[in-house]
């Protein structure tokens, strides 16, 4: 069992040893990563290749950091073979392929971090580098992902997309290898990321494939500068590139915003927008200076007006027609006080004058120098541009004074502005009433002042145009006020806006002529004494555009501001005026009404006049503008003038009724009412028997019937001229009414309605109110608290019917106009008395008028009412005196009201002078061209600035691009050099790898062989040891048994000379069981020794020195007993005498002689030393010379063991128990030895030493 267990243990040990000494693991595996390596590679070849790659990589990394200069030198010194060139080309091609194809998932290779700045910078590979590589520890191998590309391309580097993309930034900036980032250090298969990127950039730039933009370049530069790795880990050449590129990049940084087209701080506006802004600014400037400029121009115009008399015989004027009773009609055209035209006062006096040239009427002068005659009191003036005609336009009713000198009637600029554009050549004058009761009514002189076409052009061009030009001259352009209002809607081209510009110029002229009411009206103040005050509700202004406008004769309506007696329009057929007009060849009243309406309607239809009307309206904020009636605007102006005058006055007599024409919202208060006008009105009322309501003041009873009779008489006289007279009265009355209306809060719409009706041909409706004005004014002065509406009845139904028709026709237009008037003209009010039938429709208009009038005339109302208490005659006288100073401003206002019908305006628009049209067009074009030129100049300046800025930016961009290109070229050149150097290094590395592969294969083979030999030797040793162990076990067991059984018998043996004690025997027995130490041999001569003598070999213990060193076998030497005769050594180590043992009986049982296992000093291979080492420890009796020579031959086993002891040095110093075996199987007893029965051989007893002779 023991043998089997030992054999099993040995076999297991052998198996373990074979596993531990497996050759492949010792060659390919790292101690710490053997498992991982085995998982990646299943073949020894892959492991070997990996080992080679890693070793080569380390070598390459050691040689990595090379200075730019050293790189250049080494690169130039390196020999490049054609194969290397081919490798370079292949690497470039591969890089291009990777750049274009962009390999899908990038393969990351993790390699151990190695300092690139280690030693060994030699580029040439020598044998030492190979040895170093081969001797590098194999335990530093790390797992690397295996790429198919490596096997395919061999040693050509493969650039992966991730590496190329990541390294583009470094390439752009000139950044080189970054080994700190790096815990990814490339092997020879995948070069460093930055180098790969540089290589790619170099290749792509050489082929013109670089697509990176400047902004990306800068961003990458900044990113790379911020996130740059350790500079120590980069190549010096790449660092130099980076530094240079950064130096160039910093001064040449291109700001993307700066490269872009510079934005103008303010976008260039379009021409229309720019023009609007400019016009608004200039309008504000011009408005502040407009009043002063208008004042100066107005004064000059006045002078010019009075300069030329166009009704003079000297310039060619003549009388075209007159009433049949007239005598010496041409005398009025001659400046001679002794000549006059004579007419009886009982006849209707009229005449027609042809002026020497078409003019714009500005002033009329009339004179009667004859002492005993009646002077003209009221006369009606009509104008026309052609003759004969039935479309006489009523210029107005003029109220003269009872004087014997020239009386001037200047036309108010504002009111007459409606006619500024109308050039007329024919004037018709009708005398309506006269002062005194003389039989004859002579007329000595009549003058007409105005402005011809040429003068108009000169006035505007010299005064207004130049003044405006001076104001705007600094800006090198001029334009009319409100020019932008027309331009906003005008066409965008220059020619398209010419029309609007011309209209705007016309508006300027109108403003200049009529805008300054406050300054000039003071001198032109005149109180109209006509009883008919035209209370024009604001509404009728719009009607003329759509409906025919009758002549101003028929438009007038009567209104009493205090009495407020409703005036009903008399039909033109019934009115005597109409009949008188019919009698006249020039105009028939009924036909005049219809023709005027149609003619005016036709004229109004023309867009030209409508546009002009809009122009005039634009400047007057208090006026409701009707598109085709510019005269309405001027009526409003005249009303404002009258209001200012009334405020300036301290007291005005208001004992008069006020008639309001159905004109635009102009209110003309007539403080002095002509009795003649009132009389025909009352007369008509009585004749017609029509009931009429009028507002009256309750404070006092109506004036005495005498006043009414007087008024009636006057009205009867004036009935014939009433239609035209009513217009004039209405204007004058409106001027006077406004101050008085304030005290009278109640004003009814009837007047306004009537006024509107008046637009439709309605003869003198307002005359009724004039009849009652005197009484009412007196009553007003007494008490203002209450107002009543006394009614006066007219018995004629026709008048009521006519009013109804008129109202129906005009209600719509009235409503429209009222709205306009309410919104536009608050200050002006129309005092109208509603008829019973028409009261409701008229109330709305009247209410609005009341509010405006009350607000305007609060201050002047009280004193004016007091004056109205006076008799109408006194009022008329005051009015005359006042008109003398004021040049009959009210009369002028009344004339303007007459034009308010719209007929005059229309004709005037048509008759605008050709010069003015051309002038306006020219001015408009000049303004347009000026604005265009200015705009273009500004535009060109902006464009030039932008171009300059763009040029500067472009130059900067070019410079920066040049710098960038230069930097790129330098960088590219350096990268090319670096790439060439790297390619050379790559070629060398390839060679090294091939050499290393061969060397590694050879080493692997050698190591495998060596390991195989070691394993075989180990097996043999184990087998031999096993055999020896088995043999020893067997021999030891046998020897022990025999020896123990025989030893007690031989303990006691007789000695002839000496007896050994039991102790000595025990010692001897014990000593013999162990090998004997070598000692000096005891020489016994045969002569001295008898056979019977006993020689005792004494153990070392008997010697005190040897006794202490029982166990130190190596140091002691065994003394051999030498016989007297010399011994001959035998090859086997047995010592034999000269004579062999003859006694076969003795020692016959000893089959083998074992020598001590102790070896003396090493003397391997010599037979002498072996024989000496095998010296016997016992020697026989001296007599037996061959006592120690009778050893038997050694067996083969003993010889083999002897050889093994020689070969193994580690077994020295160990005591091996020898198995002593004899042929007999037992040791010779002492007795036998003594007797010499048996032969004792060396090694039979293990005695350490023999001490001397016994």
Curated annotation (Swiss-Prot):
Segments forming domain SUN: 284-453
Record keywords: Coiled coil, Developmental protein, Endoplasmic reticulum, Glycoprotein, Membrane, Osteogenesis, Phosphoprotein, Signal, Transmembrane, Transmembrane helix
Post-translational modification: O-glycosylated. O-mannosylated by POMT1 and POMT2 and elongated by POMGNT1.
One of the record's GO cellular component terms: rough endoplasmic reticulum membrane
Skewed-composition ranges (Basic and acidic residues): 241-253
Tagged with keyword Calcium: no
Tissue expression from the record: Highly expressed in pancreas and testis and to a lower extent in prostate, ovary, heart, thymus, small intestine and spleen.
GO biological process entries: ossification; positive regulation of collagen biosynthetic process; positive regulation of osteoblast differentiation; regulation of bone remodeling
Modified residues annotated as Phosphoserine in this record: 1081
Statement: the UniProt record of this protein carries the keyword Signal: yes
Function: Required for bone modeling during late embryogenesis. Regulates type I collagen synthesis in osteoblasts during their postnatal maturation.
Name of the featured protein: SUN domain-containing ossification factor
